[in-house]
C-alpha cells in the first residue's frame, strides 16, 4: 500500500509524485499511456513554457481573480524555477517573462523529471493500464485498473 497514489503521469502528476517523494512518502504513479509526459513534449510549441515571471492577478481575466492571487502566493514562479534548478535544469527568461529550458526543447524538461523520479526506490510506476474505477472505504483509496489489478 502506498501513502500516495497519483493518477496521471503528465507534468502535474510527475510534479505531485516528486513532491510527495521528497517528503518521504511512498508513491504509486499511474499513467494510462505507455510513457510518462507525452503531452509535455508539445507544450510551448515544443519548448515547454515552465512559468511566467510576470504572472499576476492583473493578467488574470477569469471570474475569480482572487484564486489567481492565492495560487501565485502559494507557489510563486521563483519557487518553480528553484525546484527545477535542484534537478539540474537550466532556464532562460524571455523579455515578456516566459521561462523556458535553456535548451529550448521540452525533451530536457521531461528528461529531468523522469531522472528525478528514477532516483526513488519508494516509487511504483504503472504505465499503459488506465484506471477504470476509484473507491474510498475506511480511509483507503483503491484504484482498479482496466487489467483488473487493484492499487491501494
Regions found by a protein language model. Name each.
Residues 45-96:
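Glycine-rich active-site loop/strand segments that organize a redox cofactor
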Residues 12, 35, 46:
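Conserved Rossmann-like nucleotide-cofactor binding loop
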Residues 68-78, 95-115, 126:
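Short beta-strand to alpha-helix junction loop
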Residues 2, 146-152:
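Core beta-strand elements of the Rossmann-like FAD/NAD(P) dinucleotide-binding domain
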Residues 122-124:
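Short, conserved active-site loop motifs that form the nucleotide-linked donor/cofactor pocket
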Residues 127-140:
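A conserved short coil-to-beta-strand element within the FAD-binding core of flavoproteins
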Residues 2-29:
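N-terminal Rossmann-like FAD-binding beta1-loop-alpha1 element of flavoenzymes
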Amino acid at each position: 500500500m502506498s501513502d500516495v497514489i497519483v493518477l496521471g503521469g503528465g507534468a502535474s502528476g510527475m510534479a505531485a509524485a516528486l513532491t510527495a517523494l521528497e517528503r518521504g512518502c511512498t508513491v504509486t504513479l499511474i499513467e494510462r499511456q505507455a510513457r510518462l509526459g507525452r503531452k509535455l513534449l508539445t507544450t510551448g510549441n515544443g519548448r515547454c513554457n515552465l512559468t511566467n515571471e510576470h504572472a499576476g492577478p492583473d493578467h488574470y481575466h477569469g471570474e475569480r481573480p482572487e484564486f489567481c492571487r492565492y495560487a501565485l502566493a502559494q507557489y510563486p514562479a521563483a519557487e518553480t524555477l528553484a525546484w527545477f534548478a535542484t534537478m539540474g535544469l537550466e532556464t532562460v527568461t524571455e523579455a515578456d517573462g516566459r521561462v523556458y529550458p535553456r535548451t529550448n526543447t521540452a525533451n530536457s524538461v521531461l528528461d529531468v523529471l523522469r531522472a528525478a523520479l528514477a532516483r526513488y526506490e519508494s516509487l511504483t510506476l504503472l504505465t499503459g493500464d488506465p484506471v477504470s474505477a476509484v473507491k474510498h472505504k475506511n480511509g483507503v483509496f483503491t484504484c482498479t485498473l482496466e487489467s483488473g489489478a487493484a492499487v491501494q
